[in-house]
Amino acid sequence: MENYINRTEPDYRWEPTKVLNEPWGTIAHYKLVSQKWRGHVWTHHLVIVRPCSIRNPDIAFLKISGDGDIKNQINSLKILAERSGAVTAVLMNVPNQPFYEGRCEDALIAYTFKQYLKTGDETWPLLFPMVKSAVKAMDAIQDIVKLEHKQQINRFVVNGASKRGWATWLAAAVDKRITAIAPMVIGTLNIKAQLHWSEQIYGKQSTKLKDYTELNLHRNVGNEAMQKLRNWIDPYAYIHRFTMPKLLLLGTNDPFWTVDSLRHYWHDLPEPKLIYQTPNAGHDLNGGDQALQTLAAFLELIADHKPLPKIAWKFNNVANTHINVHIDSNEPVGAISLWSTHSDDLDFRNNQWTAQKLNITRDSSHAKTSIPLPHSGYQAYLRLCLR
């Protein structure tokens, strides 16, 4: 992958298409050509939002996106820009599509994986140009703000959802300008273990992965070519590189992954790291409002060079009747909720989670609670609100 990312791109260029001045800042639109991949020139819509007050001129936020509603994207960028006092941007059309008989999204990614396995041509995997488009977008943002505002950006916070979240992880593995990441609804780290675990929990792979399973990409995971591919496209292969701050934005009912997919990589991820689970949310995070507010707080901390909240917890099983949970934080705890549901197995895709506020000493950096153990099955997680 790194050979592809580092390859010179003669087709790289950008040009302004429209600038809108608003009371709160400016919205600038650009046409970006990131590369030529297998004869196809990749063209993107790049939007850069600049708030009136720039208190953090050295950092920018970049969202990797597909073909979503640009108005909603800009509204989110405005919130993030005003909260962080920094430039924010969205890169659209990742990946460029459709290609190869109308394939899009996972069907296109899976097809390119299969073509690599058939031909051995290392330029095939679609995640390579997806990651490179983000790298070239960062180049363009640096060039644009330096040319137009005499501003030097050295740090990036990168965010993307699903396949774009996958590209977020991989971009952070290869580009040192990325000093924090916030991947959303992507539980693909440690692919081999995830596939094995999904088969155990569901009895088969999730139907959401059918584009991959129909090509039998979940089989022969020990095959030499498959191992080579996995070493390129599995973020877990680069896990030691993820030393930057990380916020994982997930949904409790995401049907792509098991509810405990974190078990296969969380403990191996270097600090600092945080998780936010949107309750009763699938792959779309129920519209993403809770995730956006959490992301805004995360971005503000990173932009202002402030440390992330650090949370540690211990569990004690008491006579197999309940679990005592002890929580320590470097920030005062404003509230703590117990979100729970029950399942006889680990398939939580259709479960309804309910919340119970727990009594704590407000503004203490310590909290403890007791969770009754179910007679059978599985349940529960905790959510903290920090001041």
State the predicted function of each range.
Residues 242, 248-250:
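Short beta-strand/loop motif that positions the catalytic acidic residue
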Residues 88-132, 193-201:
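Cap/lid segment of the alpha/beta-hydrolase catalytic domain
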Residues 263, 271-295, 358:
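Histidine-bearing beta->alpha loop at or near hydrolase active sites
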Residues 5-56, 91, 122-128, 327, ...:
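N-terminal cap/lid segment of alpha/beta-hydrolase-fold proteins
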Residues 170-219, 277-280, 285-289:
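Hydrolase active-site cap/lid region
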Residues 117-162, 178:
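Gly/Ser-rich "nucleophile elbow"/oxyanion-hole loop immediately N-terminal to the catalytic nucleophile
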Residues 298-340, 357-370:
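Surface beta-strand/loop "capping" patches
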Residues 38-40, 45-103:
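Short, surface-exposed "cap/lid" segments of acyl-processing enzymes
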